[in-house]
Amino acid sequence: MKKEFLMFLFALLIIPIIGIFIIWSTQFYSKMYQYPFYYMPYPFKKVVITEGANSCMLKDGSWSQVVLTDSDDMFIQNETAPKVVAFIISILNLMVSLLVYILFDFSNNQFQFIQEHYDLSFYDIYLGVDGISIYFVLLTTIIIPIALMSNWNSITNNVKSYLIIMLLLETLLLAVFLVLDILLFYIFFESILPPLFILIGLFGSSNKVRASFYIFLYTLLGSLFLLLSILTMSSIMGTTYFDALLKSNFDYTIQIFLFCGIFIAFAVKTPTIFLNNWLLKAHVESPLGGSIVLAGIVLKLSLYGIFRLILPLLPKASLNYTYIIFVIGVITIIYASFSTLRTTDIKELIAYSSVSHAAVYLIGVFSNTIQGIEGGILLGLAHGFTSPALFFIVGGVLYDRSGTRLIHYYKGIAQMAPLLSLLFFIFSLANCGVPLTLNFVGEFMSLYGVFERLPLLGLLASSSIVFSAAYSIFLFNRVAFGGSFSKFFENSIIDLTKREFYALIFLGVLVVFLGIYPSIILDGLHYNVSSLIYSYGCKFCLG
């Protein structure tokens, strides 16, 4: 491969950092009418200003810095410009990831675009992608622009800080999927926590501090077991490089120890039953962009980690303890599904729905069958599109217009916002896993893989289909119909803006198009998953 193509992966990490530097170092001002004045052009509109002031109050109640020149020209801090810069940077990164996808050879199950960087730190950094990580890279670069669009108008204070955190999260998330060293994987895996902590702590709702500490403590304590397992691997093999570890065949006793440590860390990140309190609080209290990144990408880190650390390196332990994973997954599905039926908070309902679907793709990948593993990846990607769209609708449209997340306040929204209701209906069907959506293909293949291994638990896991239909249809029916709309929302609920429509229709097209043509993803996955199953069997026999 040409040398200039090899730099694409490095560019994926550098472009957001360049965007961070531009936003941090540049003062964005817009020239307005001559001072004094009382009206401003869009997007500032009416302001309140006094003579000699160095700040003014915008129409939404926020304050903006003012610069007065000798000619009485006035410059006001432009909060839209840095948002545009961040959005352009994220779109540019999406274009680079699409180039990597186009140039990727899916008939080769080895790592490609491999880069070695010796001069960036005291530690050698290896970057590369294979037929599995390429899809998670694409998912990340797709979701970040959606997250930036979601809070376009609702974030009015500390805008630069918010944008810097979002671009920093993109860099760290991409690094997790690109590094070829398990120690660096752990470092970037944990480096995501401080930005999330600050994001929720600064821009969250009323209980944001409590939620930020929950997510930090839960995931940090869980990841200590992952660090212990990685250090054990390193001491045994003398390396932390992926390719070298793939040639290992750990003793069964060591495999059990490593499996327990790694699975605990990923069970917290998925999350599973008894370990999901942090996710619910984080989703409910997080700003909309944080919820979208959390549901769309962060929850997929455990799925990716299972493919990197458990399935190829610990085959015998993962095969022998499959039934325990299945039991945990089934209990999580049933618990989360019942919890959705009793909650009155829309955001909390979608958070519980995420826990239920995460349990389905968890048991799918641990089925150790080609269908189950491929289905688990498909369902993870589908959830990465559907869940952010639902959060966008309830947090970026309904909540921004009404100021409440309580379900019983909403009814008859279809009368005021038919386009919003139509897209809400499409994503509710996708969340149910109906045919012609990517969710259906992923859920069907995941459950099929479970049926092949343990039919009884597969039957219990299939209850997720019934439960997801129950809470998704209930939510849509209650919000879109359910009688005449409340007079409280008569003047506040309006239909989708162009920004909201473009973001939601883009995700909707992806979910439906890939549901009709899933071979676009499955053909690329098949070589890597088949190779994984083959090496799996060889190591199991040798062990």
From Swiss-Prot:
Named from the GO MF annotations, one term is: ubiquinone binding
User: Which chain regions cross the lipid bilayer?
Assistant: 5-25, 84-104, 129-149, 161-181, 182-202, 213-233, 254-274, 287-307, 321-341, 350-370, 377-397, 416-436, 456-476, 501-521
What's in the GO CC field? Answer: mitochondrial membrane; respiratory chain complex I
Q: What's the top EC group for this one?
A: translocase
Q: Which Pfam families match?
A: Proton_antipo_M
**How does this protein sit in the membrane?**
Multi-pass membrane protein
Catalyzed reactions: a ubiquinone + NADH + 5 H(+)(in) = a ubiquinol + NAD(+) + 4 H(+)(out)
- Which superkingdom is the protein from? Eukaryota
Q: What does this protein do?
A: Core subunit of the mitochondrial membrane respiratory chain NADH dehydrogenase (Complex I) that is believed to belong to the minimal assembly required for catalysis. Complex I functions in the transfer of electrons from NADH to the respiratory chain. The immediate electron acceptor for the enzyme is believed to be ubiquinone.
**In its UniProt entry, what is this protein called?**
NADH-ubiquinone oxidoreductase chain 4
Q: What is the lineage of its organism?
A: Eukaryota, Fungi, Dikarya, Ascomycota, Pezizomycotina
**Gene assigned in the entry:** ndh-4
